[in-house]
Amino acid sequence: MPATPAPASTPTALIYFGKPAVRFRLDARALGFDADGNARWLVLTKFFDAQGNATRIMANSDIDWRSRDGYVQWQTRLRYGQPAAILKTQRNGPLTMNVRANVPRLGTVTVHTDTRTWHGPRIVAQVLGPHAVAIGWFPRESTMARIVRIDGRGRRRTLVVIAGPSSSYRDETVLPGQHYRYVLDRADHRPVALSPVTTFPPPPATRVANAGGKAMWLFFTTNPIDTIYYNNLDPQAIVAQAVRAGLHYVELRTAYGAYWEVTPEAKPTIDAIIDGLAAHGIGTIGWTVPRDTTVEDLRQSLRTAYYRTAKGTPLTGLAIDVERGDEFMGGAPQGPSALWQYVRDLRAALGPRYLLVATVEDAYLEHLTQRQYPYEQIARYSDVLQPMAYWRMMRRKPTTPVQVDVLLRASYAKLVREARRSMPISIGGQTDNEGRNGYPPASEITASLATSKAVGAIGECFFDWDATQPAQWDALAGYRW
């Protein structure tokens, strides 16, 4: 039996599990039809070495995914094991995707499908938490759609009659823990009765104070080549460090887009961290990174809000990272409005009482106003705003404690103006060395904490755990909050 190949770096900085690739092919499959009224098509790359054996790229590939037939979103390689993309479309008919491998440079492969040949339900109802149900139909209706809801007592209610083009509807008048059935009636179609659905029970109790005090962002991967691979995490050491630093909570990433990161293999380690922190009175706020306003993406944030460890420990709130850019919400078809629409939809699904922290781009450091970023709308549906005030990353030259004080005061003040309301703010501070200016020294960590507290912030959460240096941990431990 041949030995298992070890991950190896190539001269082009590609990291393989196996030998370098010389060609690739595409595996494509229909993912079916969703509650947003879309057809979804998965296209996955498969790489092969010179001997024709399968090889796996672990990092640093560059793939272009192109189609004129819908919206294409690339997927983290961790979700499907290799570079992949999902096309969503409301087009009923032939679909084409061109995939070009830039790194490694292996040319372009084209793949085709036709939604008219797909099997599976084309009308879907899916629960979105305790307060919303999404109903989608494919293909798009052009004339009229009527949706009737039947509750657990058999009472019928016409929810909406949509005139003109339509493909989905969200019922935000449902109650927690209830059974519902829906009937969709469309022009020139027979009425379709959908399978019963049951809404979620109320989410765990939370409060705004859970997002106060000192905190740290913590994330991990399931890729064994990464330093933050979950198997490299030491739950006891993490808990001990959090206790020593006097942290009030940890923001732990659970989902990236529609990819749920707490895999069955990682769950025991992640649960041990959450349980260990809770034993010392330290909360864990779930952190998700939305990439689209789809039901599939929203359900990962909802899954986070309802997450419990094997011992039953709940999370203490939800923080959503609403950013522009291709790795975040920048590619969403709605453009910048997707940022606030996601927050609105999540609030509607969860209800008004669950702690929702919106991690937002810094208005002052990034020179943003309401015209470029929807601060006011995001604030309307959030309990806490958390600006990413990464003072060294955003500057051309290294800063001093005095400059940190000036920058954070300006950051706080501008966010209040852009939000156009008085509400809790937790500063997002910096411990990592991202950017040209290196790690903030301990004196700047202390200055940022002092300024955050002085201006009225409820706390400061630092990015990020893995990059935080011993002197920075000492500074955190030395400041009481």
Predicted regions and their residues:
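Substrate-binding cleft of secreted/luminal carbohydrate-active enzymes
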Residues: 389-393, 424-481
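Short S/T/G/P-enriched beta-strand
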Residues: 3-54, 102-120
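Pro/Thr/Ser/Gly-rich low-complexity, intrinsically disordered linker/stalk tracts
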Residues: 117-142, 176, 189-205
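Aromatic- and acid-rich polysaccharide-binding/catalytic face
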Residues: 315-316, 322-326, 371-405, 463-468
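Aromatic-lined carbohydrate-recognition surfaces of secreted/lumenal glycan-active proteins
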Residues: 216-219, 283-294, 340-372, 421-434
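Glycoside hydrolase catalytic-domain groove-lining segments
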Residues: 344, 352-356, 384-435
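Active-site groove signature of glycoside hydrolases
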Residues: 248-258, 304-336, 461
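Boundary/entry segment of secreted carbohydrate-active catalytic domains
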Residues: 203-242, 253-255, 290, 432
